[in-house]
Design a protein with these regions (language model features):
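Short, polar loop motifs at secondary-structure junctions
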Residues: 27-29, 102-105, 183-188, 217-221, ...
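Hydrophobic/aromatic beta-strand patches that form the interior of the parallel beta-sheet core
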Residues: 41, 65, 96-98, 119-121, ...
């Protein structure tokens, strides 16, 4: 069951799943899976209708696999008022959650009652994510906001100030250096600081013309790191970070030195970034292959439980870390 706007989560890997696959995009509170259903897969745990459908599956003893669609972000997880009480995996509604990396597994399983709920899969859509090196001779920093930059008035003021400061220093820097700053930010932020946003372009297109990235906490960080681009984290809110970066900007005074280093990154910080990426994103093997293996094992375990008339239980780790 899925929201069609997030169809990139259900990419080529779904074609490699054995058996018949049906997509359900319209459903209400009373939706239940058909009797022949072996597994329900969804990322949609943010709406009352989809949460009710998941609960119906659990009651019917139908296994449910939840897909994580990106990084955890502290304010989104713990401060935002969500439409449903469960918010962001609080609790994890399904039998298993396909996490994007080892650190996400650790953070979530540190919460009481979550141990054994998480599997380290990765992000299948990044399996073949490659960009061509920029052909431009002019170094360029891509500046990114998250899709929903703030969740309160305090947040809004701090985040707008961070982009106001960054725009000011970027303009001054550009007067003395042959560099470019591209802004992949929300329309509101773009209007406040007086720049054009590339938010409607594909991320791949923006990254192909970039040398480095400055981003709010966002999955964009991992996508840029995955291409070996130096990435700085912009966050004036001083929130805990579930994904680490080698460069962090938490006040105006840190911006200039960070820009200088992004254009000439120290090797030690690049090593740190590579290690942080490997912890935040499963990249040891194909995420698509791990997802298919997880799905197959869950179906197999479910079938065996039904055949033996036993309660549905899954091992703490199905595919290993």
């Amino acid at each position: 069951i899925r929201n069609p706007s997030n169809s990139n989560l259900y990419g080529d890997w779904i074609k490699n799943v054995q058996g018949d696959v049906s997509f359900v995009t319209e459903f209400g509170f009373d939706w239940i899976p058909p009797p022949e259903c072996s597994l329900v897969i969804t990322h949609d745990t943010y709406r009352p209708e989809s949460c009710a459908a998941i609960f119906n599956c659990i009651k019917k003893n139908v296994p449910v696999l939840i897909l994580s669609d990106g990084i955890l972000e502290y304010r989104n997880s713990w401060i935002q008022k969500h439409r449903v009480d469960s918010g962001i995996f609080n609790p994890i509604l399904g039998h298993k959650l396909a996490c994007i990396g080892a650190s996400q597994v650790r953070f979530l399983e540190s919460i009481k009652g979550y141990f054994g709920k998480c599997e380290n899969v990765g992000l299948p859509r990044l399996d073949d994510f490659k960009i061509e090196s920029s052909k431009s001779k002019i170094p360029s920093i891509l500046v990114c906001s998250s899709k929903t930059p703030w969740f309160s008035d305090d947040d809004k003021n701090q985040i707008l100030q961070s982009f106001i400061d960054l725009k000011e220093i970027a303009c001054n820097y550009g007067q003395n250096h042959t560099v470019k700053f591209n802004w992949r930010i929300s329309d509101h932020i773009a209007s406040v600081i007086g720049v054009e946003t590339s938010i409607r372009k594909s991320l791949k297109e923006d990254l192909q013309s970039s040398t480095a990235v400055i981003s709010m906490p966002s999955t964009v960080m991992l996508e840029a790191m995955y291409t070996s681009m130096p990435v700085a984290l912009l966050d004036y809110t001083l929130s805990p970070h579930y994904v680490q970066a080698a460069w962090t900007v938490s006040c105006k005074e840190q911006i200039l030195s960070t820009i200088n280093e992004l254009f000439n990154p120290p090797i030690a910080k690049l090593f740190f970034q590579r290690t942080a990426l490997a912890d935040a994103l499963q990249i040891k093997e194909s995420a698509s292959a791990r997802m298919v293996r997880l799905v197959s094992k869950m179906v197999e375990i479910s079938y065996r439980s039904r055949s033996l008339g036993k309660p549905l239980r899954f091992p703490h780790r199905i595919i290993g870390m």
